[in-house]
Amino acid sequence: MTIINELDGAKVIKQTKNDATQKLSVMFFEEKKGVTIEVAITGLAIAKYEDEEETGLYLFMCDKDWAVQDDHKVETVEEAIAWAEKNFDITEEDWL
């Protein structure tokens, strides 16, 4: 299992395991030529930008390679965990 220290320049505070066989969600991206690309979300991470003046954290939704596909801004780790539990099939025990 890979432990991630940084994503998109933000310091990772907590993460789930990233198992390519477990799809937490699917995102669809439409390309210019009308082709739709499907990307499975297989891992989540809670992270903070150290140089950001404002407070808050981000819940990153990542693909199997830990590439960030989307994010959700939250104020606390607890809020991020609660939001993830509500929107994905995970529990507090899934966090590392």
Where are these regions (language model features)?
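Generic detector of leucine side chains in alpha-helical contexts
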Residues: L7, L24, L44, L57-L59, ...
